[in-house]
């Protein structure tokens, strides 16, 4: 609470600076977004024109492509083929197909695997290395309508609209920074750039984009766009950019973030359990007997030193350690390893009787699936953990004579810049988006076109 009170004057002064900053022009423009998140390496694709008027360009040939038109592209014997409006398939001898928008509309992309999404703007299809490369060409403000709802949530408009506005400004700034650096294209992947899902996720967040149209975050002195970084949940402490990527950034510095405490459900507090043998096998060791953490001032783990039962050691960078257990492609839950803000605790073996949970660590956290393990005698207190593999893999048929390790953590993501859950909490407390931006980014102002 003292931290919150301490920062309130700063928020008021910083927000005043943001409001009084001299506006500069940030025009909407067309951007090219490569669709790699769900449509990368596509072999067969169908594009349906849902609304508007388009034209289909195939090298030197152009034809009208109005609403109701369909294009199917695929390959046969490593040769690209296409079919227009359910006509006969034909071999495509060129390398680029382009569906250009004449009037505003929308098109839907489908794959045989059941993946589909609707997009504004046009679509370019390139045949490369035995697959189709899809690029959505869309107005930058329309692009944001497919970013903000999936980076945050349309549901946050109820009581958290100022957070959506802050996200819109940050996402717009990120886009400007990426494209102004000479890159002509970004991707729709959150692992590479920022998440983008087209029209399929549009909703209440569009109002936040319209309300902040053209606004970006710039350096207070140079008025150049900053790296407006953000992640889901800071765990209660924003990280310094140099501790994650090695580059000093005066706009993204470490500081306490009490607004991210107590919110976020599973990402606010999580616990991951793994057996000593499985932990060691991930890093070329035998069953681990000791874990030592080297931390940054924020509390995030810089590196992990592991020692196994044979005296062998390995030191792993914090991010690499997280990636070894991160639940890629799985729903986020509190029994997962979600970030580098964590503590480690060993539960050692109990003589000849295996490993017991006398403290009730599993039961209190909902690991009911681990509580059915047989006990060697009735006097053993608590369920045995000797059959546990990990929180994600469950148990094995045979027990192991070594311990298990419990990793308890906070937050989700790299923690640099704006915490999305923290921004949402601030909005719920009545802060405006300018104040949210001033809190999470250092030495900035907002430019408005």
Provide a role label for each language-model segment.
Residues 2-449:
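Conserved, single-site charged/polar hotspot
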């Amino acid at each position: 609470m003292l931290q919150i009170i301490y920062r309130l004057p700063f928020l008021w002064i910083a927000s005043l600076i943001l409001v009084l900053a001299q506006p500069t022009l940030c025009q909407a423009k067309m951007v090219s977004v490569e669709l790699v998140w769900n449509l990368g390496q596509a072999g067969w694709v169908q594009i349906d024109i849902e609304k508007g008027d388009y034209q289909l360009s195939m090298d030197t040939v152009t034809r009208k492509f109005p609403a109701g038109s369909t294009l199917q592209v695929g390959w046969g014997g490593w040769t690209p083929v296409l079919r227009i409006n359910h006509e006969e398939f034909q071999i495509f001898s060129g390398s680029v197909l382009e569906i250009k928008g004449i009037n505003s509309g929308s098109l839907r992309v489908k794959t045989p695997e059941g993946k589909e999404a609707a997009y504004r703007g046009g679509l370019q299809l390139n045949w490369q290395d035995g697959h189709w490369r899809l690029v959505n060409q869309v107005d930058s403000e329309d692009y944001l309508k497919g970013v903000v709802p999936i980076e945050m949530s349309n549901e946050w408009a109820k009581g958290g609209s100022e957070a959506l506005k802050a996200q819109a400004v940050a996402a717009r700034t990120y886009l400007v920074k990426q494209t102004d650096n000479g890159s002509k294209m970004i991707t729709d992947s959150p692992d590479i750039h920022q998440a983008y899902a087209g029209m399929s996720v549009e909703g209440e967040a569009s109002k936040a984009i319209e309300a902040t149209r053209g606004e970006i975050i710039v350096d207070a002195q140079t008025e150049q766009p900053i790296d407006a970084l953000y992640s889901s949940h800071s765990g209660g402490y924003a990280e310094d950019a140099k501790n994650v990527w090695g580059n000093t950034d005066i706009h993204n510095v470490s500081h306490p973030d009490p607004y991210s405490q107590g919110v976020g459900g599973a990402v606010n507090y999580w616990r991951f359990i793994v057996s000593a043998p499985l932990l060691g096998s991930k890093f070329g060791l035998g069953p681990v007997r000791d874990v030592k953490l080297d931390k940054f001032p924020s509390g995030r783990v810089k590196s992990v030193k592991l020692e196994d039962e044979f005296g062998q050691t390995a030191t792993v960078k914090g991010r690499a350690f997280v990636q070894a257990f991160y639940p890629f492609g799985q729903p986020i839950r509190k029994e997962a390893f979600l970030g580098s803000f964590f503590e480690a605790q060993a539960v050692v073996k109990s003589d000849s009787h295996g490993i017991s949970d006398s403290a009730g660590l599993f039961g209190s956290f909902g690991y009911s699936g681990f509580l059915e393990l047989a006990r060697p005698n009735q006097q053993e207190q608590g369920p045995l953990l000797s059959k546990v593999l990990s929180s994600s893999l469950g148990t094995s048929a045979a027990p192991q004579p070594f311990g298990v390790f419990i990793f308890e953590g906070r937050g989700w993501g790299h923690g640099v810049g704006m915490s999305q859950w923290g921004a949402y909490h601030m909005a719920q407390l009545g802060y405006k988006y300018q104040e949210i931006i001033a809190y999470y980014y250092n030495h900035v102002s907002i430019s408005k076109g």
